[in-house]
Amino acid sequence: MQMVKSSFDVTPEGRLVSYRGYESNVIVPTGVTEIGERAFWGARLMTRLTLPASLRVIGAWGFAGCTSLREVASFGGVTDIGAHAFFSCTALAEVWLPPTVRRIGAAAFDGCATLGFLSLPEALTDIGDMAFRGCRSLRRVSVSPKNRMFYEREGVLFDRCGQLVRYPPGRDAFAYTVPPGVHSLADGAFSEATMLREVGLPGSLTRIGQGAFYRAKHLRSLDLPPRVTEIGAEAFGACEALARVGLPCGLTTVPPLAFFGCAGLTDVALPPGVTKIGEGAFLGCRSLRSVTAGRLRVVGENAFSDCVSLRSVSATALPRVGTSGNEAFFTAAAQKNPRGG
């Protein structure tokens, strides 16, 4: 065995609670059944990892911050990968999960910036929210054809309940059309898809998740289908090139930070049913000139903050003083006359 025993702190029950070694090639001893929370946190010298067949659980943040880790030679017999387990493993290039894996926790591979390929097994039944957020180099997801919960089409990950789970942001395509029948875009589904200029959405779509298009910075325009009634916070945040968005008639709320940092957005027409604009919804939309709305009841804090080009906010009704955020129009050019003309 290449490791000295003092490198690992293992309980009698087989839980590895901490690693104190400095090796580049780390082989976790046979008999370990669980990697404890933050056990390998910041083990920056580790480049290669081998896990034993006895392993069942990788705890939350287990290998987070292992920024030199390039290869997991074996995941052993792991069934459960905890939240943020491989957070910010920025050198990790490929992940081939074993047939035993059933669950991937929320943000498990968040920030794995060079991860290019991901293989998911037959047994997998649960993928947590934003499990692959920040994997901006991801080009393809492969799923076992025997998996009953998930499948891939042209390298894009879907579940069998009608949700697009993850579009690989490292693909070099300029356009993508979501297939008919998809009714939901998962949280972070298209986040950091920086090559995309156009995305076609199906009429079946009803929900757009939190941060769904976050930092899709070359996306130019988007038409949301009429059935969409739910849009998550930050859904279009930091889409710098987004100049036009068509919003559906059934929308009642613009969520917090929905369009923050959309520097190319110039004019927005809100559907007549929208009564609430969330906090920071248009924060930093520096080219935004006009907003047309219906009967607004609530305008959140900083909703139009730093909208330096804003000249007009027109609505059939606007909130009384005190029902809009104290800094809703802070630094906006329309601050002196936020009700527009």
Predicted features, each with a name:
Residues 1-14, 20-34, 44-57, 67-80, ...:
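Structural signature of tandem-repeat unit edges
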Residues 37-39, 59-62, 83-85, 105-108, ...:
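Consensus positions within tandem repeat domains that build extended binding/scaffold surfaces
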